[in-house]
Amino acid sequence: MATTTVPTKPRRDEIPTLGVEEEFVLVDPHTGRPSLSNTDVIASGRELGITLQPELSRCQIETATSIGTHIRDLRDQLCESRAVTADAAARTGCQLLAVGTPMYSPPHDSITDTPRHRRIAEQFGALATGVMCGCHVHVGVPGREQAIQIINHLRPWLPTLLALTANSPIADGCDTGYASWRYILFGHWPSAGPPPYFDSAAHYDAALAKMLESGAILDNRMVFWDVRAADHPPTVEVRISDVPATVEETMTLTTLVHALVITAADAIERGTPAPTVDHEALRGACWRAARDGLSGHGFDLTTMGLIPAPRLIYQLLTHVKPVLVELGECGQVTGSLAAVLEHGNGAIRQRRTLARHGRVADVIAECARRTFEGCLTEPDDALPL
């Protein structure tokens, strides 16, 4: 008896690699003010078997996953790194917060004492005193030329990723009026913001050379664009997001970025050019995302008009849904996005807690709890605020 077969879409030969970096604030558990103790926490983490990195301010710490290809493998790493880092912080008398900015300003002498960090402080003055914690998602690419093309395809989606993860509405003990105050602060750096559209890797490298020559950056690591090309190994690094409040939100962000890069690579393979979004319109959309987050409006770069911010999330989900289905992640991402839209992201929850209790101390306590929410363990010696 003859049989027929139904043609199916061929399996993707290779899934791009993934890696995630998260930056955190260290605070005094009794006052909520920044704790300048990253060196001690790094040493404590080493004893617990985790490698932590210092950031520009002594009240910051960074974690990084290993490189892998499966989203769900990263979840265990993210949970473990948050829980163990919170434990390392507690053992040195401080508390770990997944927030985009500290809710109180650090002292002016907060620069981490390394040659590189001192050089940055000397060159950029008061800019270096700002404390900003983000989440950086690296997705592997074959080479630099394709990385630049993918960056062009990702530009229109940057504001949506920021609105989704906004997690820094409070600074100096007050609501700033922005869902992501971190993004506004970061915009003061000369190499920050959305990148322009680049014709080629040579065009991209020429822009870096001009910034180096002017002193706007000291090296290529100081290119703070919202998405950039990274080397060794070659990746596209999406940097626009505040550090998400929870592991679940970091997982959602990571999966969306992974799907965006794969979707862009597929478009490049088909010969579909990236949209040449006007740079000033994109900057305006990013500002709007920083201001409103998910609770207000976003700027639609197709219609050039304001729309409810949740509609931007639905547009993003529609754009990457075929890849999410292929990766087996559509249900997880759809459910996570629905939960965020119903219950709020980090910025919304911080404001809700502040409105309910009227004390920044309660916001800090809630943020500390959510930092390792859903993780397997909690810090052994966590101190209540």
Curated annotation (Swiss-Prot):
It comes from Rhodococcus jostii (strain RHA1). This is Putative glutamate--cysteine ligase 2-4. The keyword Disulfide bond does not apply. GO terms for molecular function: ATP binding; glutamate-cysteine ligase activity. The lineage of its organism: Bacteria, Bacillati, Actinomycetota, Actinomycetes, Mycobacteriales. It holds the Pfam family GCS2. It is an enzyme of class 6 (ligase). Keywords: ATP-binding, Ligase, Nucleotide-binding, Plasmid. It catalyses: L-cysteine + L-glutamate + ATP = gamma-L-glutamyl-L-cysteine + ADP + phosphate + H(+).
